[in-house]
């Protein structure tokens, strides 16, 4: 059970680091008055970010209540979110190849999507470890 505690702590730390890596480049971008995200980027990421927030809240509730009913569905949701975020990255890379939009904005956007993907992955892993820890 010490292993699960340590793994859980590692995943929680990774979530915090990913959120920091997500937020800092966006803040720098805004502070430097660089171009905003394109309407397509805002729309695409906005749709998935609402789903990510819902997923994170459900995971937090499950861990807090120590009630793992619906665990498999949440893990399936994490896989769906990861696939959606991968599709966003592919779409952005196609836009870069088509030379539409600012490369600097694209890099900030790709970083946002990657770190959001990390948050989802680490949260799903934290959920798995928490459940294993509680079963012991």
Label each region the model flagged.
Residues 1-136:
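Cytosolic, long alpha-helical scaffolding segments
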């Amino acid at each position: 059970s010490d292993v699960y505690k340590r793994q859980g702590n590692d995943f929680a730390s990774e979530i915090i680091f990913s959120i920091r890596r997500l937020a800092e480049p966006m803040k720098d971008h805004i502070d430097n008055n660089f171009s905003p995200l394109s309407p397509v980027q805002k729309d695409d990421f906005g749709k998935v970010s609402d789903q990510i927030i819902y997923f994170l809240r459900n995971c937090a509730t499950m861990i807090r209540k120590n009630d793992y009913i619906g665990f498999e569905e949440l893990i399936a949701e994490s896989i769906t979110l990861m696939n959606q975020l991968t599709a966003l990255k592919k779409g952005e890379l196609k836009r870069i190849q088509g030379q539409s939009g600012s490369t600097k904005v694209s890099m900030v956007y790709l970083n946002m999507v990657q770190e959001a993907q990390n948050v989802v992955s680490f949260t799903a892993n934290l959920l798995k470890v928490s459940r294993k820890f509680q079963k012991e």
